[in-house]
């Protein structure tokens, strides 16, 4: 597996695991604040192991070939193109599976595992909803997009059709435009046949997250994954 920033549960034993994938050019450290944010939001999150994997360093074609942390190559700044890094995307999906398997090996029940991500990481997290070999607790996609749509439809696994999905997107996003977020949600609800899919938009929010979105995310997780402890 790739390296990761890990923040152990403050309440033992750990009962939950949240695996969160960062965006292009970032690292796991960039999203590690989410652990403290959720732990301070409600005590139910104190029994969570937080895992923030680091993407490998690789050249990104759309950035002039500059090496940077990236889960897969982005060849052009077009979120609907079929000209994508299929191999890199599928390799990163396998990494997600490894982190899920590792959490299960650590004693976390699959229904208490959450897979999420931001931007490039959200593309992987949402795709994991139709590719994982396990039925888990929830999926999170913040400012994400849908890559490899045809391939995902052809290889879709029907293990998480009712698993809760939280998908948030800023209406002022200038990196992954808001209409792409809407199209992504429609794709996963229709072609992906994900029946328990929550899509929320945030006025004035760009390509980032804000307290309104994070609070909605926390409430979503409390209701759908942590309900017996919240």
Swiss-Prot record:
GO biological process assignments: fatty acid metabolic process
General function of this protein: Hydrolyzes fatty acids from S-acylated cysteine residues in proteins with a strong preference for palmitoylated G-alpha proteins over other acyl substrates. Mediates the deacylation of G-alpha proteins such as GPA1 in vivo, but has weak or no activity toward palmitoylated Ras proteins. Has weak lysophospholipase activity in vitro; however such activity may not exist in vivo.
Localisation per UniProt entry: Cytoplasm; Nucleus
Chief localization: cytoplasm
Cellular component annotations (GO), alphabetically ordered: cytoplasm; nucleus
Uppermost EC category: hydrolase
Name of the protein: Acyl-protein thioesterase 1
Source superkingdom: Eukaryota
Keywords linked to the UniProt accession: Cytoplasm, Fatty acid metabolism, Hydrolase, Lipid metabolism, Nucleus, Serine esterase
Catalytic reactions of this protein: S-hexadecanoyl-L-cysteinyl-[protein] + H2O = L-cysteinyl-[protein] + hexadecanoate + H(+)
PANTHER family from the UniProt entry: LYSOPHOSPHOLIPASE-LIKE PROTEIN 1, LYSOPHOSPHOLIPASE-RELATED
Family: Belongs to the AB hydrolase superfamily. AB hydrolase 2 family.
Catalytic residues identified in the record: 119, 173, 207
GO molecular function list: carboxylic ester hydrolase activity; palmitoyl-(protein) hydrolase activity
Stored Pfam families: Abhydrolase_2 (PF02230)
Enzyme Commission numbers on file: 3.1.2.-, 3.1.2.22
